[in-house]
Amino acid sequence: MYKFALIGCDIGYTSSPVVHEAVSGELGIDISFEVCDIGASGLEAAVTKLFDTVDGIFVTKPYKNDIKRYLDKVNTRSGVNVVRCADKSGFNTDGIGFLYALDRAFDDWRSKVRGVLVLGSGGAARSVAEALADTGKSVYVLNRDMVTAAKMCRAFGIEQYYNQPAELIVNCTSAGSDGEDILKALCVSPEFEYAYDLIYYADTPFMQRTAAAGAKVSDGKAMLVYQAIEGEKLLTGVKADTLDVFERAFAKLDGKF
């Protein structure tokens, strides 16, 4: 049996246990899955303990960048969302999971989209921005903290947003889960052709307003499943077709998150 844990702060909403149960079943492996909801002051102690007690750690907000200081090797420029405890190595499966999800939600986006606006500059935003930049799209970043946005732009060779043309908008912030309108907060028009919200557990104002303005929209459920599949494959060495595993696991999860 493989032992996994999820580490984050204020994550009582998480559907990760049920998602990983479905994914592991389709991969043919037995797992246990522990949720560690901890404050920043307890991060080091929690990570140190988990290194000795589990095989892999899945990392969520707000620790995808902070986790790096406890690792011996980091295999990504983006935020770390998967840690292999045996050698204290960090990886990112958010980026590939996001692209899988985007392809599933909008089958024509690769030919129709030239510019993308990414909201946020945390670990998830960095993963999304890097993945999009690697596809050759023009990526623009908008965040309340201009300093962190500027650092992110320098890291990935992308630009801060000053109303450049963009067909796709991606919300990588947690704003909206509590009813906050991130578009209003950042003074952004909702008029885009495509809108993707990484939030999967709430019908956000971001989703509502972009849909009302005519956009094709999607929430983050598929991305959560895709990144979990890639993470479990990485940690266990199991070889499997991600798209095939996704369809079976996602069908199992219908209505559960």
Predicted regions and their residues:
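Rossmann-fold NAD(P)-binding glycine/threonine-rich loop
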Residues: Y194-R248
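Phosphate-coordination loops involved in phosphoryl transfer and adenosine-cofactor binding
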Residues: M1, K112-G115, F192
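Glycine-rich adenosine-cofactor-binding loop
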Residues: G8, G90-G95, L102, W109-G136, ...
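Rossmann-like adenosine-cofactor binding region
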Residues: R154-S218
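Short, charged/polar "capping" segments at the starts of alpha-helices
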Residues: D66-I67, D145-K151, A202-F206
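Conserved S-adenosyl-L-methionine
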Residues: D134-S138, A213-K216
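Phosphate/diphosphate ligand-binding glycine-rich loop within oxidoreductases
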Residues: M1-D108, A202
